[in-house]
Amino acid sequence: VDRPAHSDAALSRRHALLLAAAAAAGAAVGSSATAHAQADPIVDDASLERALPALSNWGRWGPDDQLGTLNYLTPAKRVEAAAQIRTGRVVPLGWEFGVGTPNLRDFSYEMRSYTDEPPEEAGSLDVVQLNCHGFAVTHVDALCHIYTPGGRDGMYNGYSVDNATDSGSAVLGIEHVGAVGIVGRGVLLDVARVRGGPLPVGSAITPDDLEAAERAANVVVGEGDILFIRNGAGPANTYRHGSGLHGSCLPWLHDRRVAVLANDSDGDVHPAPAGFDMWPEPVHMVGIPYLGLTLLDQAELDGLSAACAEEGRWTFFVSAAPWRFRGGTGSAVNPLAIF
């Protein structure tokens, strides 16, 4: 496993990120990120750059960590989350897709029928090729999916981009997520419901929106939560026009110690808000390589919203099991919410 071996400046920057994260690791929840957010809110590239040391989780769980914020999902948190199962109602959170689904990337499909020699077992097999990233498939991003800008500071936790080859990544692959799963308390912050309907595509969700949705749901997002944020536009979100979280939400997510962030889009605003030219997709460009935040993109949240309203609560048990493909950058997934 390779560590960064770039310029002295890059090594110095990595050292600063490691020190900042290590110092923050023992702090009380909310102290570092909230103070930074109040003193220097993220409004553009420059303020985001200044926030990186406070946002970084490099070294928080040791120099060899490959789970990032999934470390917040402890066995105790999973046991606690099991109490969310009261009625047994199951809601799928992955979009159904197949041949004919628009916007699938690098997709091909072939069904092959067969009949064996006597006793003539008959059936069919299929072969699927799919790029799970993008807006058509519900998927989980591995921490090797997005590097620091240009890869100059490596990947999450300081791993070198040289670990990524044509055969996959030697570190931070999706198999690490698959080994522990995404299992815990889910919380839906239904921003669309609070605002009175689906957000116009291209809208930015702010920390104020998140806290308004918290109040409406009478919940508090906390350490180890699997956070779902609904903008309501669903498949209408695209790389051309899509709703998501403003960069100013990053300290909020860091402060709350969210384990997994899930959206009914890719989580970023498209096109990027004014001032974010170097960091146009902060949820991905900062969330993955600096926070070590596991992202669950393009979830189907309309059904979840309806179920929460009917059940009268906005918390539930979540189980999702990405595949254990070594070195993979992500996995299609169908998370299940259980009430």
Which residue stretches match the model-derived regions?
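N-terminal secretory signal peptides
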Residues: 1-12, 19-29
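Basic side chains
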Residues: 13-14, 230
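Intrinsically disordered, low-complexity segments enriched in polar/charged small residues
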Residues: 18-19, 144
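Active-/binding-site microenvironments in catalytic and ligand-binding cores
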Residues: 38-339
